[in-house]
Amino acid sequence: PWVEAARLAHTGAIGDPQMVLLRSVIPYTRYLQLWHRDNARSGGALNDKGSHHFDVLNWIADAPAVSVSAVGGRSSIFTPDPDAPARCSECDRTCPYRRHETLVDRFEGVGRVANPSWSRARDIEHRNDNCVYLPGSDIDDHAVVSVRYANGMSACLFFAIFGPWAEDQETLEIVGSTGRLRMERHSGEIDLVADHGHRRETICFQDPDRGSTHFGADLQLVRTLRRFYGGEKPPVGVAEGVASLRMVLAAQKSLRENGQPINPQTLEAVR
C-alpha cells in the first residue's frame, strides 16, 4: 500500500500533493527494553523508526527538505523507578508493557523469548526484557516534526512509541490540489477522495504475504534485492539514506532547541 499511495500521489490522482501527514502512534515500548534504550547505541527512536518515516516523506515530496522543526521529547509515562525489578523476567507486578506478553509482541510472533541467550544475558544492552522504568534510558519517546520542502510542500510526522495496539496505529495521509488519500498500514487499505470530493473509492490489497513480518515487506525486500543482484538498477541510493538521517539529526536538534527550525543540509538554525 505504501508503493500504491506514492504512485497515486505522483500520477495526479489527487492533483498536486500539497501536504503530508504520517501518523505513527505505535506500541513500541520495546525500544526501552532492548539496546535501543541508549541514544549512543541506537540514535534514539526517532532514528530507529523515524528515519524510515522521513524516507517516506521525502519520497512523496520528491524535493529536498529545507527546514525541520520538532517538539516532544521524553514523556512522564516512563518516569524512572529505581525500586522496580530490572527486567520483566524478575518482576511480578501487573504491567501492560511486560515483554513477550504485549499484543504487539504476540502479533509479531515474539510471544516468547526467541533466543535463550537473552534470558542468560546480564549486561543491560544484551537483555531484551529490561524494565521500561529502569533508570538510564535517554531516548525520546514522542515527537511532532514539521518539514518544509523546496517545492513548497509541507509535511508532518506525528510519532509516539507508547501508542495502544490499534488498527490505525500507522497511517499516511496526502492532501493534493483536487483530493486526498489516506493509507492504513495495518489493513493495507487506501481511502481515496478525488475530483474535489465527487469521487471516492477504497483500494484494498489482498497480499498473500501480509501475515509475514512487516506485513510482507521483508519478503518483498528480499525479492527486490535479488532483482538488484540480477542487474536491475535501484531507484535510490546512498544519498537518499543520508538525506533521511540528516532529517533525524535536524529533528533531534530542534527538540533540544525548543522547536527552532533547523536546515537539515547544514544542521544550522533557519533564520
List the predicted regions and their residue ranges.
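NAD(P)-dinucleotide binding in Rossmann-like oxidoreductases
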Residues: 72, 78-219
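C-terminal helix-rich "cap/oligomerization" subdomain common to oxidoreductases
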Residues: 150-151, 182, 187-188, 196-197, ...
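A general structural signal for well-ordered alpha-helical segments in protein cores
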Residues: 2, 53-54, 218-223, 248
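Residue-level signal for the nucleotide or nucleotide-sugar donor/cofactor binding architecture
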Residues: 48, 169, 236
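Catalytic cores of eukaryotic secretory-pathway lumenal/extracellular enzymes that build
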Residues: 23-28, 32, 221-222, 250, ...
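Predominantly a Rossmann-like dinucleotide-binding segment in NAD(P)-dependent oxidoreductases
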Residues: 1-130, 258
